[in-house]
Amino acid sequence: MPAHMLQEISSSYTTTTTITEPPSGNLQNGREKMKKVPLYLEEDIRPEMREDIHDPSYQDEEGPPPKLEYVWRNIILMALLHVGALYGITLIPSSKVYTLLWGIFYYLISALGITAGAHRLWSHRTYKARLPLRIFLIIANTMAFQNDVYEWARDHRAHHKFSETHADPHNSRRGFFFSHVGWLLVRKHPAVKEKGGKLDMSDLKAEKLVMFQRRYYKPGLLLMCFILPTLVPWYCWGETFLHSLFVSTFLRYTLVLNATWLVNSAAHLYGYRPYDKNIQSRENILVSLGAVGEGFHNYHHAFPYDYSASEYRWHINFTTFFIDCMAALGLAYDRKKVSKAAVLARIKRTGDGSHKSS
């Protein structure tokens, strides 16, 4: 792939910023520079944002990893939550239809708070959102209860920059269970604290809405993740409190959590690597179904600045559909999308041969 790429930006707020190849006159110059420019610096179209670009210069120190320090509070609470979710499954046949629809609705909205909000907007800056959309996404993110946006984005940027090392919060080289949920049940590796603490998070520190959520996160999550989804079915259509709590709240919350976690575990262990065979992330359609579009993970790690997190936009990608709808309403803009030429060049250079164009 050429070392330099140009942006085509229209004055319209609904435009998509596209990475394109340089004019033909620059091809030879581009090839010469390719020899000098590291792969991880070639392709970013956000000069103001580099904290999520993989840094291959960082390597784990030799020697045995530190002993795991279990966080028993998290272990007990997570176990109880999953037991509650299993009981919720048994209550599904006797639940009211409105309760099930409410659970699905709450699942989708809270999932968007992670995918369109914490992930594609605030972690990667792949598009921009006007205030009404940012307010919606911060509320949806609070509904999901997966840490506040600031902490989620810091961990995720570290995951990309130091992927598959001890500085990666959910390093998949430590196994499926660790990358899925185990990383939340133990103290963070010292490298995660060290490297994560050095990341530039000034963009989020400067965003008042993100800092407001962080300041009031505990009461916010109690209201939006637990109290509201339980009270609405109970009060509005006479569902039993038991069904409201265990189906609408515990089961729904557990499903959203595991859908997100599968991106960290299954999508780093199972699937093809059509864009870059040198990284662990994979294309996993089943993960995309549950995580509303986040399973095209080899593409996402190859091009973390693409707002679609996929080559194919709406294909099994409800999050991209949502962002495009918001763009049509004028609430999302400056959506960054990698050009077809750039994608094909990357496939040819580093793909595993599984792409249909190969």
Swiss-Prot record:
Q: EC number(s) per UniProt?
A: 1.14.19.1
Ranges of biased composition (kind: Low complexity) = 8-24
Transmembrane portions of the chain: 72-92, 97-117, 217-236, 241-262
Q: How is the cofactor bound?
A: Expected to bind 2 Fe(2+) ions per subunit.
User: Lumenal face: residue ranges?
Assistant: 93-96, 237-240
Instruction: Provide the tissue specificity.
Output: Detected in liver (at protein level). Detected in adipose tissue. Detected in liver when rats are kept on a fat-free diet, but not when their food contains unsaturated fatty acids.
Induction entry: Up-regulated in liver in the absence of dietary unsaturated fatty acids. Expression in adipose tissue seems to be constitutive.
Show the catalytic activity.
octadecanoyl-CoA + 2 Fe(II)-[cytochrome b5] + O2 + 2 H(+) = (9Z)-octadecenoyl-CoA + 2 Fe(III)-[cytochrome b5] + 2 H2O
Q: Which cofactor does it need?
A: Fe(2+)
What the entry lists under InterPro entries is as follows:
Acyl-CoA_DS (IPR015876), FADS-1_CS (IPR001522)
Q: What is the effect of changing H156A?
A: Abolishes enzyme activity
Please tell me which stretches of this chain the record labels as motif Histidine box-2.
156-160
Record keywords: Cell division included?
Answer: no
Quote the annotated effect of H124A. Answer: Abolishes enzyme activity
Instruction: Tell me the keywords, alphabetical order.
Output: Endoplasmic reticulum, Fatty acid biosynthesis, Fatty acid metabolism, Iron, Lipid biosynthesis, Lipid metabolism, Membrane, Metal-binding, Oxidoreductase, Transmembrane, Transmembrane helix
Tell me where the sequence motif Histidine box-3 sits in this chain.
Answer: 297-301
**Miscellaneous comment:** Desaturase has a half-life of only 4 hours.
Query: What protein am I looking at?
Result: Acyl-CoA desaturase 1
Instruction: Give the species.
Output: Rattus norvegicus (Rat)
